[in-house]
Structures are given as structure tokens and as C-alpha cells.
Regions:
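Short, low-complexity N-terminal intrinsically disordered segments enriched in polar/charged residues
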Residues: 2-9, 16-47
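Surface-exposed, charged secondary-structure patches
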Residues: 26-30, 78-116
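Solvent-exposed, acidic/flexible segments
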Residues: 27-35, 46, 50, 70, ...
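Short, well-ordered alpha-helical segments enriched in acidic and aromatic residues
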Residues: 47-60, 64
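Short beta-strand segments enriched in hydrophobic/aromatic residues
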Residues: 57, 111-113, 137
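A short gly/proline-enriched turn/hairpin at secondary-structure junctions
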Residues: 61-71, 84-86
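Short beta-strand edge/turn micro-motifs at domain boundaries
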Residues: 119-141
Length: 141
């Protein structure tokens, strides 16, 4: 009887430990407000920080460049950011929250380089995963 109880206890401990390893990592950006999500986006694009990109972009994320008509999905844009990991843009970056209502937020980020200016219009949406970047539209005024 004692051996059966020990075996059952060992089985429960093994199941519990295997379950803890199988759990997916929690989203570290889940509790951030829209302002901090915009800052995280800018850190990814202008400073090459790709640590939280998996959680930063919504599943239906799209990136559009008005100047050349390019459009990219989440997978394509994350691959681009990963390829340019660590690359820091030599620009002055400012941003502002244009509007936030309910589950949607619109922000504008301006990156001033020596010879040109890049403006990103960033749309964020809030879901159970918290605020995420759902669309970016880049212009060069």
C-alpha cells in the first residue's frame, strides 16, 4: 500500500512538472498602455530591439509604405526587423497619440533624418492580449 501511494505521488509530481514546462510564456506587454506600446514599436524600428516583437504586433498586422506601394504581413515585417536587429537609425524621433477611443488608438511617429523625414501612422487595437500594433502606414512628406 505504501509503495502504491508513493508511486501515485511521484506520478502527480511528474505531471505537474511537465505541465509547467509546456506552459506558453506570458505576454510581457499585456499590461502596458498604448503610449508604452508605441514606444516599444519605436524601439523595435529605430533602435533594432526585437525582444518583444512576437507580442508587439497583432496577428492581422499589416505594414504599408506609401512611397513605393510595398505591403508586408506580420511575418514579413518581423523577419525584416530581425534581419536589422541592432541597427540604430541616426534620427530624432518624436511621437504623439492622435486619438484613443475604446479599443482603438491612433499614433503618429516622426523620424527626422538629415536629408528626409519619415512619418509612421500607427494603429493599435486592444484585445485580451493587451494593446498591439495592428497597422503601420509609412509616408515621406
Amino acid at each position: 500500500m505504501k509503495r502504491t501511494v508513493t508511486t501515485i505521488a511521484a506520478a502527480f509530481i511528474m505531471i505537474a512538472s511537465f505541465s509547467s514546462f509546456a506552459a506558453e510564456k506570458a505576454n510581457p506587454l499585456r499590461n502596458l498602455d498604448s503610449k508604452n506600446i508605441v514606444l516599444s514599436y519605436l524601439e523595435a524600428t529605430t533602435a533594432g530591439n526585437v525582444v518583444w516583437n512576437k507580442h508587439l504586433f497583432a496577428e492581422d498586422f499589416t505594414y504599408s509604405n506609401v512611397a513605393n506601394g510595398d505591403n508586408f504581413s506580420k511575418k514579413q515585417y518581423r523577419a525584416f526587423l530581425k534581419a536589422t536587429k541592432g541597427l540604430k537609425y541616426d534620427c530624432t524621433t518624436t511621437y504623439e497619440i492622435l486619438d484613443e477611443a475604446g479599443q482603438t488608438c491612433m499614433a503618429k511617429a516622426t523620424m527626422k533624418f538629415d536629408n528626409f523625414t519619415r512619418v509612421d501612422y500607427i494603429t493599435l487595437s486592444k484585445s485580451q492580449e493587451g494593446w498591439q500594433v495592428s497597422k503601420v502606414l509609412t509616408t515621406y512628406p
